[in-house]
Amino acid sequence: MENLRRHIEEITSITDDEFELIKPFFTIRKVLKNQYLIQQGEEAKYEFLIIRGIFRVFYLDENGKEHIVQFATKNWWMSDYIAYFNQKQANMNVLCMEAGEVLCLTLEGREKLAMTFPKMEHFFRVKLTNGYLSLQQRIISLLSSNPQQRYEEFANNYPNLIQKVPKKYIAEYLGVSRETLSRLYSGS
């Protein structure tokens, strides 16, 4: 749980007493490689804070084609947010790509934390704002950048993922073929 405290204190300071009251809202879960945290059609009960591991958030279209929305690693938050915030069935899958550990937070727990602790409301607001910014940047990149620019941006922003995530998934995330990614990778 010390990872959680450090993560919170990157944004706001909390006392030992406050942290003792915050901890029970989170549960720790160990996750095996290729284990799902969320699958399409299931309820998305939790938002997850990654303690360790690499995860892939994706959906499968009606033809079975995978569309990767996000990779997530240490200190990143992830879920199927449409399902989580609306308490509906998931459209996304969250799959562990490397054995890991996450902290799980229910929507009810999140709301109670935000109402009880103004510092946590501030923390969640900052995290949500950062998520919006990242999402908008990803959309702009997909709409206006060429494959080379998207690859360079990904490599600069996520150098640890370039080495750990299989190339086929990076290609899917960038919206390019595996062959195009190979050319980009060898040219950098």
Where are these regions (language model features)?
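Short, Lys/Arg-enriched N-terminal segment that forms or immediately precedes the first helix
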Residues: 4-6, 131-140
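Glycine- and acidic-residue-biased ligand/ion/polar-headgroup-sensing regions
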Residues: 34, 45-56, 74-75
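Short phosphate-coordinating micro-motif centered on Lys-Gly-acidic
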Residues: 37-42
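His/acidic/aromatic-lined binding-pocket segments of jelly-roll/cupin-type domains
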Residues: 28-29, 45-50, 69-70, 173
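Phosphate-/nucleic-acid-contacting segments
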Residues: 145-188
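Cyclic-nucleotide recognition modules
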Residues: 68-125
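Cyclic nucleotide-binding regulatory module and flanking cytosolic helices
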Residues: 1-27
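Short beta-strand segments in beta-sandwich/barrel cores
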Residues: 27, 36, 54-59, 101-102
